[in-house]
Amino acid sequence: ALIRSAFPADGYRAYAASFGLTYPEDIRNGANSLLCARDAGAYLAAIDRFIRTNPYGPELKASLQRTKNPMIRSSYPMARKYGWMEGAYHDMAIVYAPHPYRLAILSNHDEGTKEDLRMFQEISMLIERYSGNT
């Protein structure tokens, strides 16, 4: 409640809509929002821009690089954000490879099983291989 009183959801919705989201109405109250792959990419682009241009960018990057969830894998450092709630198991990352790239993997899985983790890892390693970074 304290954070929401200082940073109301309406302000967040307006800020996020400036990213060029396909479905800004899905932001709801700033939590447990719906997300499509294109909008995940828009968020990653905004995060990347913030990291590169804002004085607090290095702090955000360091925080996102400390995330240790085992979903997206890479041989390179990553700034990542995962999401997990009923009916949604997602991970997205900025991969700092020689040819940097952004990757978002969204699923309707909600349990985080070994099979789910394997799926995320296989997809992310295929992307790394085909991105010309291996």
What residue ranges belong to the model's regions?
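Penicillin-recognizing serine hydrolase domain
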Residues: 1-134
